[in-house]
Amino acid sequence: MKHLLFFLLLATTSASAQKYAGGDISMLPKYEEAGAKYYTHDGKGISDVLTFFKDEGMNAMRVRLFVDPKEQTTNNGKWETDYNVCQDLDWVKALGKRIKDKGMKFMLDFHYSDTWADPGKQWTPAAWASLDDNALAQKLYSYTKDALAQLKAAGAEPDMIQTGNEISYGMMWGQPTDTGSNLKRCWPSSPADNWTRFTNLLKQATKACREECPDAKIILHVERTSVSQQNDNKNHSALSNFYKKMKEASIDYDIIGLSYYPYFHGAISELEGAIDLLKKDYADKSVMVVEFGYPYAWAVGGTTYDYTKTYPYSDAGQKAITADVVTMLKKHENVNGLFWWWPEYNAKGTNLSGWYNAPLFDSNTGKATSALTELCKFGSSSTGINATMMNGKQEADNNYYTLSGQRVSTPSHGVYIHKGRKELKK
């Protein structure tokens, strides 16, 4: 049997929990529409980016949802045009269905805002601005439930749901023009009433998720992972305070979601310190890094931490830091997800500026960067087989094999081994 494959087991297979490697691809349809030219690592044209991501080893994708996006964001309280704020419910239904149809897991990121929601801004949707706190909570419940029902009907039922984006300081503070006590921020030092208002809102969001998508995992997402760059987070005190408040309020959730951008959050050891704390205090929760990224070229605007002596801004540097993050995360059994933010950005073949330099494609060449391969090593679809032997010679090929080791030219229905990973062909 000349095509019989004998597997060289170079790693131990373990029955660990499912791990997810993926990215937030919320802008992919825009780049496809703009005619972006995507290429593999070795320069072959990519006709379907989602298929390419899956073949590389990604098994989950994240998409953000705004309430009523108008391609606008705020800068110092003033509204400005933002091409990237376009993900309404119809957008997410279409992209979510594409993800599900590929056999990948779908993470939905509710922003509960008309524009970007992060620690610097969490604006209440304009249409909800006049509601009192009780009415706002009820609106949040009905909106969440209806959005999920529509996604299910469209074939885009989420497997994981973020009830808010980077909500370290709460959400739906009010309007950009509000000031003082009218802004319902939830800093560690904020009034207890602000925190009560916030947790009451969260309870309605999570209630709707459990009712409409009972099998989905609920994620609470924050970005207080740095002790050196975030002044209120010495010894991870702000991070600890947030999840303590969630526990005291009996918020129903499954996964702790973290952001980690080394150029904002500092060394890898700072992320690991946050994970260690969470593992000790919240052993019943899984942890995911739902946003991660690092440049392959120049510094990202607003960078506060220079890591370039260890990880230069280059393809090799981006690859190295990704590999080291994956290695660290794999040491922690409670960590089950790693998602690259905006991996699909690619100006090649378009009239886009190419300003963003931390995706997983090089805008100058359109080629996938080396970091993509490293990121995908976090996923748990690996068979534990890192290499194969044919007639005593190690091989690295793109062929498909049955579980008994038989090479097949055209895989049909069933489970196969491809690039050392199990792959289901439907």
Predicted segments, located by residue:
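C-terminal tail/sorting-segment detector
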Residues: 415-426
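Aromatic-rich peripheral "rim/lid" segments of glycoside hydrolase catalytic domains that contact
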Residues: 38, 180-181, 273, 277-284, ...
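Substrate-binding cleft and catalytic face of glycoside hydrolase catalytic domains
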Residues: 51-194, 199-225
